[in-house]
Amino acid sequence: MWPEYRDLIGGWFNEHPWHQKVRIMVGDLADPLVAFLGPSIEIEDEIYQIRDFDVRGSKVLLRLDPASVDLTRPEVHPQPYGWPLAWTRSYGAGRVFYTALGHEEGIWRDARLQRVMRNAARWAIGKPAEDR
C-alpha cells in the first residue's frame, strides 16, 4: 500500500456491504457544497465502508444513515465515526474532496449529485459553490 494514500484521501476502502436504496444525511447544513440538499436525501448505490478514517483532518459532508440499512450483515464493520460517504480535507497546499458514492451509473445522472460534484470541483480550485 501507498502510505500517503490515507493522508491524501483520509481513509481506506473496507468492503461494500450494501447495494440498495439508502438515506444519506447531510453532515453540515451550512456548508455550501451540500446545503442545497437539505437534511437528507435517498439514493440507490453500492455503499462503501471506510476504515481508519481521519476524523480530525476531514470535514464530513455526507454520511450514511445507519437506520436505512441492515447493520447485522457479516461484512459490516461498525466504526466510532459511522459511515462517512463524502468529505473535504487538505493535503499539503491542496484541497481534497472525496466521495465513496458513484458505483452505480444512475448516481452520475442524479442532478443533486452532479451539483455536489460541480461544487466540490469549484471548492477544490478556490471558487464558491453554485448559487442556485
Regions found by a protein language model. Name each.
Residues 11-92:
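Catalytic beta-strand/loop cores that center a nucleophilic Ser/Cys/Thr
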Residues 1-4, 32, 112:
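Exposed alpha-helical structural elements
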Residues 68-132:
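Extracellular ligand-binding/catalytic regions of CAZymes and related secreted enzymes
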Residues 1-14:
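A basic- and aromatic-enriched beta-loop-alpha substructure that forms the phosphate/nucleotide-
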